[in-house]
Regions:
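Catalytic, metal-anchored helix/loop core of enzyme active sites in primary metabolism
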Residues: 1-383
């Protein structure tokens, strides 16, 4: 029987690649619901191609355009962030793919898990912001979470079938766009430079987060919540080739690693198909083309965001939510050429140093912390 999919953020990088998987396996998947933030043209085209039941545009200003573009079809059209969350909880889907970017992904994650859905999660911010709440809800509803992030998919695959305790998780890191750039030159980097990721093809925000290593810090937090591993047992290693996606070291000294070419369709396919694997077309990994795989420690002075994220995890509460909110504002400002690249982490530090803190947060506390962090970051950047 076909799996019925709701794809949240279908017009973004992960959403588009998820639909690539559907095209490769038309007998396995049925696209029921699609959502986008503003790109109504692509959303309409996707809804037509995959004969979706429902299309939702989060930005209500584009409702009319989407409705008109889908006139004459049977596609139901809705608008607004509440509608996105309602789609996530919809009763006629089996799997929710959360490919949204940022804090906006939290409410749909909560809605999907609350309805007991299988969640294929690319929106790491759901766990960065509200990991304790989200994992407790998933356990209560017995709703499985399958990570789409390549690093966490790799760890998940390494842990399948294992019952022994682990010594540590080893998350690999490409180093981002400025891996080989001296610290003294970081003050003058441009948006165009920051968007040139050396290995992965991703959306703009996550590519900037990769350049600051905010993304890697968030992945440490995500790994903690997904696998119940304390921050002291999570190691980040620089691995420029991006072939080893992550590793798990066990108590007996054995290490399992998951390898593959840098292609997000592999972890997406794994999340959708687990516990099976799909037969995928395309070029296979050639060991002869990669005779050398190298690893190194991360320069934490050059990339302070990694330690900031680890400290937020140690503090728990709303600390990571504050970091995320400030980062979202600062990255948008950088992409809009309203601040320097170095100002991104400075804005995060400013917000964390001034924000209020809730030790045992509710969903309402997360919302308040996000709003406060965004205000403080904007204050620092004079936006």
């Amino acid at each position: 029987m076909k799996q019925r999919l709701a794809i949240l953020g279908s017009t973004g990088s992960i959403g588009v690649q998820t639909l690539d998987i559907v095209r490769e396996n038309p007998s396995l998947f049925e696209v029921r619901m699609l959502t986008a933030n503003r790109n109504w043209q692509r959303l309409a085209a996707q809804a037509r191609e995959f004969d979706a039941d429902t299309a939702v545009i989060a930005d209500e200003r584009y409702y009319g355009q989407l409705r008109d573009a889908l006139a004459g079809t049977d596609v139901k059209v809705y608008a607004g962030e509440d509608a996105v969350a309602q789609v996530a909880a919809g009763g006629d889907t089996d799997v929710v793919v959360n490919a949204l970017v940022g804090y906006a992904g939290l409410a749909p994650t909560v809605a999907a898990l609350g309805a007991g859905k299988k969640l294929a999660l690319a929106n790491k911010e759901s766990l960065v912001v509200g990991g304790e709440y989200v994992m407790r809800l998933a356990a209560e509803k017995r709703a499985p979470i399958l990570p789409i992030d390549s690093e966490h998919s790799a760890i998940f695959q390494c842990l399948v079938g294992e019952q022994s305790p682990i010594r540590r998780l080893i998350i690999t890191c490409s180093g981002g766009a400025f891996r080989d750039l001296p610290c003294e030159k970081l003050a003058d980097v441009t948006v165009e430079q920051a968007l040139r990721h050396p290995q992965w093809e991703m959306g703009g925000k996550i590519t900037i987060d990769s350049s600051t290593l905010v993304n890697k810090g968030f992945e440490v937090i995500e790994a903690h919540w997904l696998f119940g591993t304390p921050v002291e047992k999570i190691t980040v290693l620089l691995h420029p080739q991006s072939i080893v996606h992550s590793m798990v070291e066990f108590e007996d000294g054995a290490i399992k690693a998951q390898l593959g070419t840098p292609d997000m369709r592999m972890p997406i396919s794994f999340a959708l198909m687990y516990p099976r694997r799909a037969t995928r077309p395309g070029e296979r990994f050639d060991f002869m083309a990669h005779p050398q795989l190298t690893f190194a420690g991360v320069d934490r002075a050059k990339y302070p965001a990694l330690e900031i994220a680890c400290e937020c995890l140690r503090r728990r509460g709303t600390a990571a939510c504050t970091m995320n909110g400030a980062n979202e504002v600062a990255v948008a400002a950088f992409l809009g050429r309203k601040c320097a690249w170095l100002d991104i982490v400075r804005a995060i530090e400013y917000a964390l140093g001034r924000a209020s803190f809730a030790a045992a947060p509710t969903l309402g506390d997360y919302a308040e912390a996000n709003d406060e962090a965004r205000r403080l970051a904007a204050e620092y950047l004079a936006l």
